[in-house]
Amino acid sequence: MQHEKALVVFSGGQDSTTCLFWAKQQFSHVEAVTFAYGQRHDAEIEVAKEIAAELDVPHHILDLSLLGQLTSNALTRHDLDIDNADVPNTFVDGRNHLFLSFAAVMAKQLGMHHIVTGVCETDFSGYPDCRDQFIKSLNVTLNLAMDYPFVIDTPLMWLDKKETWALADELGAFDYVKERTLTCYNGVIGSGCGECPACKLRQNGLTAYEEVRV
């Protein structure tokens, strides 16, 4: 893959930033795309901008604010409290489907075949569009829809959060990911608020990894 180019679906969070570091080692040229979909915190987009600039990665921002007109969830609605149901109310219907579809359109225009996303089935938090089955199905659909050989790369698919921290460390990005990324649903950079489901998952993985880190 060293002579190929890739587009990373990028939010500025732990997972997508780890994927960005991974992609920079795997591909000859990497760009990133971030989607503005009416998320609770503009900070997510600002963090993504800053990280892309610091890593010298060309960065695109696409407006998908129409998602807020179609679905009600705790990631786009400030008046909804975050819950932990079987499918949490932080799940945005169609989000990864749309993100990857728009990323594919952009990738084709840029002459790229690889699309990198940080979805993960091991710690998928009840989100159906993070499952390997969905990604493989969408990959086939996109190839047929655009008659173009896309490859959706999912380097975190079978890693839990402990293993994701280990990968960041292998990539030389452990401290950067720990201090600079925004995973928190409440918009707190780095270690986060410590209370939301995303922060708890991130911290549990970090604690588990630091216990065995050499």
From Swiss-Prot:
* Binding-site residues for Zn(2+), renumbered to this chain: C184, C193, C196, C199
Kindly tell me the pathway this chain contributes to: Purine metabolism; 7-cyano-7-deazaguanine biosynthesis
Catalysis: reaction(s) = 7-carboxy-7-deazaguanine + NH4(+) + ATP = 7-cyano-7-deazaguanine + ADP + phosphate + H2O + H(+)
Q: Which Pfam families match?
A: QueC
> Keywords assigned by UniProt?
ATP-binding, Ligase, Metal-binding, Nucleotide-binding, Queuosine biosynthesis, Zinc
Q: Which GO terms describe its molecular function?
A: ATP binding; ligase activity, forming carbon-nitrogen bonds; zinc ion binding
Q: Which cofactor does it need?
A: Zn(2+)
Q: What does the Swiss-Prot or TrEMBL cofactor note state?
A: Binds 1 zinc ion per subunit.
Q: What class of enzyme is it?
A: ligase
Q: Which InterPro entries match?
A: QueC (IPR018317), Rossmann-like_a/b/a_fold (IPR014729)
PANTHER family from the UniProt entry: 7-CYANO-7-DEAZAGUANINE SYNTHASE
SUBUNIT field: Homodimer.
Which family, according to UniProt? Belongs to the QueC family.
Please describe what this protein does.
Catalyzes the ATP-dependent conversion of 7-carboxy-7-deazaguanine (CDG) to 7-cyano-7-deazaguanine (preQ(0)).
Name of the protein in question: 7-cyano-7-deazaguanine synthase
Question: What gene codes for this chain?
Answer: queC
